[in-house]
Amino acid sequence: MNIEIIYRARVRSRDNLVKSMKNMASLLDLRVGFWEQGMRIVLCPGGYMDFGWQKEKGLLGQWRLTGGCDTTPLGAGFHKAVVEMLDLLGKKDLRELEVRDDTGYWEDRDFERLQKEHFYPWLTREVDDILNQLEDNACLQRYWMEDQYQPQEIPGTLITPMGRFSKKWLQERQGDRLEEIAHRFFLWEQPGDNALCFRNCALKRMWEDCYYATSARSKEDAQTNRYIINALEEASELDPSLPLPLEDYRLLCRLDGREPFIPDTAPQMVEEFAIGYRKEEVMQPFDALRVPLPGIYRYEWSPVGQGGGSGTWWDEDSDSPVWRFSGCRNPHGAAEWNNDLDGMQDVEEREFSGARAHWGWSEVKRRRKKDQDDPLWQVVCEVAAEDTLYLVSVLYSRPEERQDIYDRLRRMELGKRLVEG
């Protein structure tokens, strides 16, 4: 059973609350997002507080706020940070604040008891459950968002946003060495701003979010690289004895074009596996379709019409193939191929998980004379799966890339549909 904090309150003016939250976010260096039905306060990577709001009836009706957050598996330090944020909001903006905290920390503020009586027992049960499920010939995921990419599977390992762990590593630390697991599992285990929290925030971004691409490639790459570098340097300053992932730190400094600040004499953190799921191939989802692509490929959505559009994956830093995905649903029944691929070469067909796919390649005709010295080729693929027809087109500039593209299409999978309707 996860550890949660539930809260509710009232405010007289939603607009004043939004204005106040924007000012507070700027002062405290927090991220706050707003939408029609509520707001979200982000306290750390993957750690946030959600609030929904609703106007009460009557001319003088106030706004009722309700919300909650799951503080596992982020850790007792995150739980404390949520309580302190509620304290701040209760003094500043919220009226009639009510908090339900089953750990009792809201009332007694005993951090040691919170950690020893609630988070460590939760972690003990969690590790026991993981080891009961984790088989030597299979891979297990925990706390992983279903609608994002799927990391490469390694038998006998656990995939989490905080890193990959082997069954043996967990077994060796089960019981008396549980604290070692806590230091790596919990992103924010200890109270306040501390070196371990900064390091683990960096590790989470390195494992799950970082493309290991140059900061010049995109704004997203620059923000991710610099967040990691700054967090590791903060950790080093707060506790020079804390082991850090120095090899990856220096690599990210090179990708960001800056000189390393952490000295070479700093202790090196030892990991079982190379940090960064995106350093390897990953399974990228487009609705129910899953295609194995290089982890460095970045995704962009291009809207078309009302609610339609296409998704594109590629690496802007290199002359990589450009993968473009789109899809349409048949409201009257099963989807069928639209294209017989006439004029395509090396046409292949494949059936998998109830889906039917076919693809082939052709040279792209260049209209402008100046482009004709730089030939392009294209692989076109259709996948009919239940009521949906997926179109995959791959543009590439080197003939030798065709075999790799075909190999990836042969390894496509069909999973659960991510968007219903």
Residues covered by each model-derived region:
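Short, conserved charged micro-motifs
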Residues: 11-21, 331-339, 402-403
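Secretory pathway targeting signatures of secreted, lumenal, and periplasmic proteins
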Residues: 285-340
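Acidic (Asp/Glu-rich) sequence patches and key acidic residues
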Residues: 1-279, 306-321
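Short secondary-structure junctions
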Residues: 25-37, 295-304, 342-357
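Short acidic-hydrophobic surface loop/beta-edge motif
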Residues: 41-42, 278-286, 311-313, 350-353, ...
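Signature of long, low-cysteine stretches enriched in small and polar/charged residues
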Residues: 338-396, 400, 420-421
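Hydrophobic beta-strand residues in large extracellular and virion-surface proteins
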Residues: 5-7, 21, 291, 323-325, ...
